[in-house]
Amino acid sequence: MINKPNANSHFSFLNSATDEILPSIWPLLEQGLWKQADPAAFEENTVVGVLKRGDWKPVIKEFIPFYREMRWDEASKSAYDPTYIPKIAKTDWGSVIDAASNFFNKYQSKRIAVQLSGGLDSSIIIGLLTYLKIPFWLVGMNTNRYEFRTERHIQELLFPLAEGAILLDFDTHLPLSQLLEVPTHQHPELLSINYSSENAMALTCEQLGIEVLLTGDGADNLFAEALPDDPNLCPWIPQVFSDPWPAEYVYAPRGVELVPFFADEGFMDAIYNLRRGQSEDNSKWWARKYFERILPLELVQYDYCADFWGLYISGMQAAIPTIKSLFDQAYRLTGNFLFSPKSTEALFSQDLLEAKKEMYQKIEARTAFAVWLHGLKKKGITS
């Protein structure tokens, strides 16, 4: 591999033809590289999924995003995501508390908040902070929709534990809203279509002086995945713990560091040693029982799963005029059939109330690609 990745960014770019790492492709985009971007390849990558991002095809000519956590295999001349290999050690409750304390100590001079969802994962973080008597704020999304009644109840139980709590109305920051305001970015990104809610939380953090926002990303893997006896076979890969796009393009510009608590190696080691050899536990009963001393009783005795479908389809239906406008613009810029009036009509003439994954993958991928082009146009690159 030629050159090192950009240490100051979550992203660099790998030239798959030369094995060269570029810290940025902005100069090339300004020279017209964007014209060689392939929306079909981006759509295929969406189907492959982020868990196998090492298998993604180049979307912009031969350039592939090379994420900070990725490694380079010289033998195969390819990028890959390394699995985490936990350290074996005797572990008990004290070990868990020590790991959490060591993590929080890294931010002891900063004002921290937890991204409050009303679910188990963020509640564990809140419970640990409370147990350690560390002050914190709560920032999150809330909705009066019936399907989120349990999350609302848990949020209300946790409010008094924090220095202060701000909950924003999810129905005013639906998925696929504010697409025209998405920050300009170098490469198409699926997470850009969820910009609105992330931006609302980032803005709130900035207004409150919050410097670090802790998320529960990755807890599903720690607490629900089957864990082998052999730590070398541990399945944990970097991208299940963090979303680099909102961290870099939404939170960082507002002076907020988005930090996934469960990606801390000390805490990962502790949970691996406690769950080592356990089978899949999708309801996370082990975690509910193990952390019962710091959790609301409801989270210990019951399991539930948030249903975001209603929010999603509301956002989709409201955004259709904007999406069609973005597709029209993308078609004028690229001439690509995927954005043609005929293709757009075929895409949106389907029954959108059917939760068909393959249908929504196409809509989301094309929307994210069109949003990327719109950002380049705002920056004056495509004109």
Predicted features along the sequence, with ranges:
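Cysteine-centered catalytic environments shared across enzyme families
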Residues: M1-L174, E211
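Adenosyl-5′-phosphate
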Residues: L33, K61-I64, G209-I210, L214-D217, ...
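Short acidic-aromatic active-site loops that bind/stabilize oxyanions
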Residues: A89-I97, H187-L191, E257
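ATP-dependent adenylate-handling ligase core
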Residues: N142-L203, D220-W236, I271-S279
